[in-house]
């Protein structure tokens, strides 16, 4: 990864998916690029610091009186910070303590930044760097949400099932918020007075894609994913259960069938508006995966053609699953290599695309056009037909999104604490 020799990095233990899921009950040891000994208590480094405040009355943002703005740094009491071991690592910490939570939050943010700095080929600055030397990573149990804002990333938790599930232990939620930070830095913070609905949808889609691709950097998740699906990624599975909160509740499913025509009369929630774009990119990921399987000789051209013809028909599951079962049994190593290749191709293409986008009047057609340009630059257009076909299936470029039909709700992230900026 960009930024350091992994053999000399710092170890953390992270849950690839929420730890209350049976398949992911134990955290996995990962190595981040920060050299061992460079991450101090907190954890903290030269770019960010992690705290678990005691007695912090409200999350950052607009105060309940509607006048004051609560902003970092928090200057009150905090839980005892996590300490590195004698070799500079944090993987000795056990779940169930504030110190493990703060280490998990810091380790996840650093892990995701490593991944995306690898795709960008450079350091990704935080958009708050002109004001704050470091970003505050904060755990706020009274918050039933998670936000990446100006100078902070704040994690609450979920109480919808009756028991508290902290987002500081949820890799997908944290990675999603890091995704927002990446887009704020690379594309820009939306201007509420001059922004398109599709920009809001693009932002949510990009954050989901950051979480999706980042999760595929866990060997345990990739192995379990392939073992469960036998390589048939159109099955509903771990990789497209973004921000999963329980075994049967999924948010923003990437493998969706939503189209832009559903929003021709207008839109209300940017999360819904994001789904055609996220779905198009998930389908592109799967199609590139199939191309890589062909390159490795793991499937035949006839099998790929049949998969394309039967997709979205009642015959797909019974016929194609048997063929995938046989092919995966013969070539499990090639299936894994093909998936990792597809992951890195999509990650690199997205990074190159986001670098070139302009937030002004941004729409999904712009995203697709730039993505095609990136493919042309990298391969001479090898995947152009795949890209065009999947955008066409989502009506992107063929249907214009209607107006915003209602004010953004309390659950909206588009016009929220995330987009508050200091006055110049």
Go through the PLM ranges and name each one.
Residues 1-110, 114-117, 126-130, 184:
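Acidic/polar low-complexity interaction segments
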Residues 99-102, 109, 113-152, 157-174, ...:
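Zinc-dependent metallohydrolase catalytic domains
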């Amino acid at each position: 990864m960009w930024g350091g020799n992994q053999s000399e990095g710092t170890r953390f233990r992270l849950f690839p998916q929420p730890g209350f899921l049976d398949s992911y009950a134990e955290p996995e040891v990962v190595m981040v690029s920060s050299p061992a000994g460079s991450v101090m208590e907190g954890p903290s480094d030269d770019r960010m610091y992690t705290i678990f405040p005691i007695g912090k009355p409200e999350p950052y943002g607009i105060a309940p009186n509607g006048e004051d703005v609560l902003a970092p740094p928090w200057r009150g009491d905090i839980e005892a910070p996590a300490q590195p071991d004698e070799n500079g690592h944090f993987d000795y910490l056990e779940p169930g303590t504030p110190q493990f939570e703060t280490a998990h939050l810091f380790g996840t943010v650093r892990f995701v930044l490593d991944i995306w700095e690898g795709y960008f080929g450079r350091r990704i600055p935080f958009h708050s760097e002109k004001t704050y030397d470091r970003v505050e990573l904060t755990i706020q149990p009274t918050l039933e949400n998670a936000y990446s804002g100006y100078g902070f990333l704040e994690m609450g938790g979920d109480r919808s099932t009756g028991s508290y599930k902290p987002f500081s232990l949820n890799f997908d939620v944290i990675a999603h918020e890091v995704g927002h930070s990446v887009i704020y830095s690379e594309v820009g913070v939306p201007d509420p007075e001059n922004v398109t609905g599709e920009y809001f949808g693009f932002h949510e889609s990009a954050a989901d894609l950051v979480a999706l691709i980042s999760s595929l950097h866990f060997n345990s998740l990739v192995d379990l994913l392939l073992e469960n699906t036998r390589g048939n990624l159109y099955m509903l599975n771990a990789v497209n259960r973004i921000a999963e909160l329980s075994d049967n509740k999924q948010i923003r499913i990437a493998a969706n069938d939503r189209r832009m025509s559903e929003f021709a009369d207008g839109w209300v929630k940017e999360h819904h508006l994001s789904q055609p774009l996220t779905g198009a990119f998930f389908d592109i990921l799967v199609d590139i995966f199939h191309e890589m399987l062909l390159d490795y000789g793991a499937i035949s051209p006839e099998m790929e053609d049949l998969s394309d013809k039967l997709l979205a028909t009642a015959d797909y599951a019974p016929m194609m699953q048997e063929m995938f079962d046989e092919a995966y049994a013969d070539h499990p190593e090639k299936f894994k290599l093909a998936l990792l290749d597809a992951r890195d191709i999509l990650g690199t293409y997205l990074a190159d695309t986001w670098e070139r986008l302009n937030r002004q009047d941004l729409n999904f057609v712009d995203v697709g056009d730039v993505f095609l340009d990136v493919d042309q630059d990298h391969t001479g257009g090898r995947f152009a037909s795949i890209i065009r076909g999947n955008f066409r299936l989502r009506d992107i470029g063929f249907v214009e999104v209607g107006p915003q039909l209602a004010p953004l709700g309390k659950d909206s992230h588009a016009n929220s604490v995330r987009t508050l900026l200091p006055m110049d």
